Amino acid sequence: MLIDYLFRLPLNILFLFSHSFSSFLLPFQLHFMQRAFVIGLIAALLAGIVGSFLMLQRLTLLSDAISHSVLPGLAIAFSFGIPLIFGALLASIISVIIINWIRTESRLKEDTAIGIVFASFFGLGILLISVIQKENKVDLNHFLFGNILGITSEDLQNTSIILAIILLFFISCYRQLKCYTFDPIMAQTIGLPINFLQSTFLILVALTIIVSMKAIGVILVLALLVTPGATGLLIGKSLEYVILTSSIIGVSCSFSGMLLSYLFNIPPGPTIVLITSLIFFILFLIINKKDSTTDSKLF
């Protein structure tokens, strides 16, 4: 009996390994998971690129306002049967215009204007979606927390177009945007189109948020925009390195988060966000420890 068991042990181990490996490969063979992986990776890549500039320009709060301001646009677009991307983009542009209008026409500071618009648009969006939910049986959670596993081929096509537009802008205007990001006064002095750069960048932020919403929803989209960029700033010594690092971190976390969500039957959006946050805190503690050790050696 013992000899027979020892003889079969390698075969049993091989069977368990092959079964586990086939379970691991199963998500990549399903069409809806393939679309989910592509959308998630594109969203993470764009968030890493755009988020790096957001962090350096200190526009984190504005991006949060834009992400929550798209809700009314989503609700209205859904009601009239038009593509959600157009409603979300229009709502985000209107929110930015209103923020700038309040800031320039009153003594209120930008953060106050952002808070007012953020709360107003988000409240209106929740109200409209709640009404639509009763009439059309739409799940509110899909808007708030994303529905990456319900992505269609049309969503994939729209996302690919957005990716091409954003990459084209950053490739063609990278030097100008870099100059404006680090020194707006010098950029204005040398005659760079400041208004064009700022307006176009905010529109691209809105497009990135719309893409990311499919992956993790309105509530958590700020984490995907900010956390990889913040992690890149911790270890990056140049803008190019920060963009590269944040993009790699975002893509890796998106891939692993979706894979874990399928294997353990947990929501993909929160899983992606938690992984990115975990990586940030681990690197933060490591770098902090190194800095404190270096400082202690100096005295």
From Swiss-Prot:
Keyword Transmembrane listed: yes
- Name any one Pfam family assigned in the record: ABC-3
List locations, semicolon-separated. Answer: Plastid, Cyanelle membrane
* InterPro entries recorded: ABC_BtuC-like (IPR037294), ABC_TroCD (IPR001626)
Membrane topology, record value: Multi-pass membrane protein
Write out the GO biological process terms.
response to zinc ion; transmembrane transport
Which parts pass through the membrane? 13-33, 36-56, 79-99, 112-132, 151-171, 201-221, 241-261, 267-287
Keywords on record = Cyanelle, Membrane, Plastid, Transmembrane, Transmembrane helix
- One CC-aspect GO term: cyanelle membrane
- Source species, domain of life: Eukaryota
* SUPFAM superfamilies the UniProt entry points to: ABC transporter involved in vitamin B12 uptake, BtuC (SSF81345)
Q: Which family does it belong to?
A: Belongs to the ABC-3 integral membrane protein family.
Q: PANTHER family attached here? A: ABC-TRANSPORTER METAL-BINDING PROTEIN (PTHR30477), IRON TRANSPORT SYSTEM MEMBRANE PROTEIN HI_0360-RELATED (PTHR30477:SF13)
The protein in question is named: Uncharacterized membrane protein in ycf23-apcF intergenic region
